[in-house]
């Protein structure tokens, strides 16, 4: 109970002699107000009091705890709980007998079993779309019962649920058409074995299902089959002429196939004959002296065929009984009398084409579903076309004024959030988009702006299938079954083994050219390449050879013989020994002897004696001989060995003034030659003797001097000196 309600104080019981009106005083204002109140207001207040009591019960914690206990019990024990079963019975009884929700049936049915008896817990194990399929099949059974086309046996309506697994829905044996519900249908495989048992305890009629299984095996495109053997259809199936184009309904039926049915389809030969008779496109199968079977891609199409087939058979039977024979009947020609095209429902006086495309028989089937819903059958059918057209509001933003409230009444329920309303609206739009009969294709169209600039770029758009320009002519093949191109009557296990083998090869990354063609096995194709491919391959080959030539250096001795290599090695060793001997001689000559002071008054030797060796040689002569030897070695060797020496004042020690005066003019040329050669070589170290007149400190001995070429006039003077000697 609510906490706001406070129990009133108990009034004392009235005395035995006190009447009802004696309890109130006539002067009481509350009594006067209730007495003067109108009867309508009094009734409204009484209803409000009753609603208030219901609201208090729904908001009470005890009621909430009881509901939670029922939900927990359902989750633990399942749908077989006694409390849940009682609630279902009460809900079904109230829904079927309530005249305010559903109008009364024209046949005055006081109680009828609803078609959609699937609850939320039951639909959890169903496949995608199976709930709606069950409701459609059960509705077809009820329509057969209402039209009087139902028979006691072999009147079965089957539907293919899954093409991949080949599961089908069929009613159990022993259940009449008026008793079939969505939950009572049984799901079986192609062999008639039960996959999922319904709510009833009746078995499956495998003999009656054998005909349907043979049809589904021969026609993978068929999804629904309705077996009908009413008196009219059985009479036409027994005629040699078959169904004649006597009425317009016979033209709407389409092509028909005739088959001699013996009552069962257990033999393999019977299945092959049925496949040959049925063909790839026929939708009506006439069973001789038995009845007819209507096929369709959808439940709506199959019932559309059955409805017009029954009407055509009734017209033909009545016409033959009245005319007395086929020769007295006027037959219609298919070319002259064309039936209406599929989905061409148009407005009156309109020439702009179809109003809205739809599947065959969809509008008629939805009308019958609305009839069943109005009768209280609760079909559970999802309508694609609304019965009442939505009124367009051009000025909806100004027709309804804006209202703002700052408080919420306690009696009002919890307001629905705007986000939830927006989500529900989006879901409705999505459902309408998914249920559209139009077929759209994804097409790449060149952009006009980019096309004008000279670089066309494709633009992806969605277009209707009818508007897309077809590049190739021919009849398109509708592929609905993944095994559509598998040969008939093949071993399914063999197909599965081959599929598993291919998947195993893909897992192991084993790539091959695939199975070899038996027709092209003996054909030898010449390898031909285009000029562009040849040029690309040649340029690639040149680049590879160029890289290889840059990476590897050619061997200069690859063209020589062994004898030439031996001679070359000996020559290299000989030159190496000569260089070592010359180097030893240079070192011996460059080594300074004992320090001897040069006397300024020493006799001047002639140039002829300058090259001879003597035990006591002046430092000047020794330096001259050393310089001459170095000059001769510099002319033969590219990089002469330079001994370390001491450089005084940044240049060689020049001869003294006394020597220059005594030698004369001829001697001066020789000294100039020696002085020029001294700039190319390093001088010997001088430990004693007179320093240069400048007296500047000596530079670092490790510093190298720049070499100069010997002038040509000095070379001539050397030749003259040799001649004189």
UniProtKB/Swiss-Prot annotation:
Residues 425-444, 703-720 are annotated as: Interaction with calmodulin. The keyword Thylakoid does not apply. GO terms for molecular function: actin filament binding; calmodulin binding; protein heterodimerization activity; protein homodimerization activity; protein kinase binding; spectrin binding; structural constituent of cytoskeleton. Residues 596-621 have a biased composition (Polar residues). It is a peripheral membrane protein. Its main location: cytoplasm. It is found in: Cytoplasm, Cytoskeleton; Cell membrane. Found in a complex with ADD2, DMTN and SLC2A1. Interacts with SLC2A1. Heterodimer of an alpha and a beta subunit. This is Beta-adducin. The lineage of its organism: Eukaryota, Metazoa, Chordata, Craniata, Vertebrata. The gene is Add2.
């Amino acid at each position: 109970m609510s906490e706001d309600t406070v129990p009133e104080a108990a009034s004392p019981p009235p005395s035995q002699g006190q009447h009802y009106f004696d309890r109130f005083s006539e002067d009481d204002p509350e009594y006067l107000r209730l007495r003067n109140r109108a009867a309508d207001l009094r009734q409204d207040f009484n209803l409000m009091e009753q609603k208030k009591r219901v609201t208090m019960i729904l908001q009470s914690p005890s009621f909430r705890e009881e509901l939670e206990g029922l939900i927990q019990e359902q989750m633990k024990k399942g749908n077989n709980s006694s409390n849940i079963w009682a609630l279902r019975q009460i809900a079904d009884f109230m829904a079927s007998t309530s005249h305010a929700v559903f109008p009364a049936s024209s046949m005055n049915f006081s109680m009828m079993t609803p078609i959609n008896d699937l609850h939320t817990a039951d639909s959890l194990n169903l496949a995608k779309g199976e709930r709606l399929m069950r409701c459609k099949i059960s509705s077809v059974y009820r329509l057969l019962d209402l039209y009087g086309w139902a028979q006691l046996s072999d009147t079965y309506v089957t539907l293919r649920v899954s093409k991949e697994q080949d599961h089908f829905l069929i009613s159990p044996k022993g259940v009449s058409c008026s008793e079939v519900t969505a939950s009572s249908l049984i799901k079986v495989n192609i062999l008639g074995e039960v996959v999922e048992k319904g709510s009833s305890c009746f078995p499956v009629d495998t003999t009656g299902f054998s005909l349907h299984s043979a049809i589904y095996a021969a026609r993978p495109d068929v999804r629904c089959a309705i077996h009908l053997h009413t008196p009219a259809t059985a009479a036409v199936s027994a005629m040699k002429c078959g169904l004649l184009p006597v009425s317009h309904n016979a033209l709407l039926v389409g092509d028909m196939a005739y088959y001699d049915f013996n009552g069962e389809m257990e033999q393999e030969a019977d299945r092959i004959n049925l496949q040959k008779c049925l063909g790839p496109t026929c939708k009506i199968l006439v069973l001789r002296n038995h009845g007819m079977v209507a096929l369709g891609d959808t439940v709506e199409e199959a019932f559309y065929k059955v409805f017009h087939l029954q009407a055509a058979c009734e017209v033909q039977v009545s016409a033959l009984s009245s005319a007395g024979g086929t020769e007295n009947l006027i037959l219609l020609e298919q070319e002259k009398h064309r039936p209406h095209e599929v989905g061409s429902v148009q407005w009156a006086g309109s020439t702009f084409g179809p109003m809205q495309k739809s599947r065959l028989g969809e509008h008629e089937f939805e009308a019958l579903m609305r009839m069943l819903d109005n009768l209280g059958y609760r079909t559970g059918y999802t309508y694609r076309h609304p019965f009442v057209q939505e009124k367009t509001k051009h000025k909806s933003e100004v027709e309804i004024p804006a209202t703002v409230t700052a408080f919420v009444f306690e009696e009002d329920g919890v307001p629905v959030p705007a986000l939830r309303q927006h989500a529900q609206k989006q879901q409705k739009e999505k459902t309408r988009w998914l249920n559209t009969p139009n077929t759209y294709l994804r097409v790449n169209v060149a952009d006009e702006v980019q096309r004008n600039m000279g670089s066309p770029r494709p633009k992806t758009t969605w277009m209707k299938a009818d508007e897309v320009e077809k590049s190739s002519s021919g009849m398109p093949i509708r592929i609905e079954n993944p095994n559509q191109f598998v040969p008939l009557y093949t071993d399914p296990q063999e197909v599965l083994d081959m599929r598993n083998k291919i998947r195993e090869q893909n897992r192991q990354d084993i790539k091959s050219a695939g199975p070899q063609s038996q027709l092209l096995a003996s054909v030898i194709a010449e390898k031909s390449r285009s000029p562009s491919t040849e040029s690309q391959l040649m340029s690639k080959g040149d680049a590879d050879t160029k890289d290889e030539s840059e990476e590897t250096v050619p061997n200069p001795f690859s063209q020589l013989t062994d004898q030439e290599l031996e001679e070359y090695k000996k020559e290299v060793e000989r030159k190496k020994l000569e260089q070592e001997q010359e180097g030893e001689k240079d070192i011996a000559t460059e080594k300074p002897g004992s320090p001897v002071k040069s006397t300024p008054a020493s006799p001047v030797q002639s140039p002829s004696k300058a090259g001879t060796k003597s035990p006591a040689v002046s430092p000047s002569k020794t330096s001259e001989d050393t310089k001459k030897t170095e000059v001769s070695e510099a002319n033969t060797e590219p990089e002469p060995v330079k001994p370390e020496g001491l450089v005084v004042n940044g240049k060689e020690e020049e001869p003294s003034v006394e020597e220059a005066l005594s030698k004369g003019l001829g001697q001066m040329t020789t000294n100039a030659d020696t002085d020029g050669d001294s700039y190319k070589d390093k001088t010997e170290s001088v430990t004693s003797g007179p320093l240069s007149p400048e007296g500047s400190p000596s530079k670092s001995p490790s510093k190298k001097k720049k070499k100069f070429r010997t002038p040509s006039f000095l070379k001539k003077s050397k030749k003259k000196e040799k001649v004189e000697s």
